[in-house]
Amino acid sequence: MGETWFLTPNGQSSPGSWNARPSAGPAARMPTPRNRYFSRPSSTPLKVCTAPRAAPPPRASCAPRATPRRGWTMTPWSNATWPTRRAKTGSASAPAGPASSAPWPARSPERTPSP
């Protein structure tokens, strides 16, 4: 556990390859804790792998559904941009003022019922 690993370029083969070499020497390249972590009973991975194998058929059937969803997400986005542009052109043609900027008539204090 006291080993320190370094990534050194492997000059013997291609210049782009890197090898992890321990400082303890070539004999300690495969420490025993690595074998303990990766050596598992073969029955455990087989049981885990058989359960997800039943899932790909539904995933394959969902693949054609993904194409209409992409088009559907683009439609509201494109429609949402047009009303904002129309509103800008309409408000620009209207005369400037606090009452004219609102699309609905402003309430005046005279319309409130008196007790």
Swiss-Prot record:
Bias (Low complexity): 60-70, 91-107
Region (Disordered): 1-115
Extent of Polar residues compositional bias: 7-17
Name this polypeptide is given: Uncharacterized protein E-115
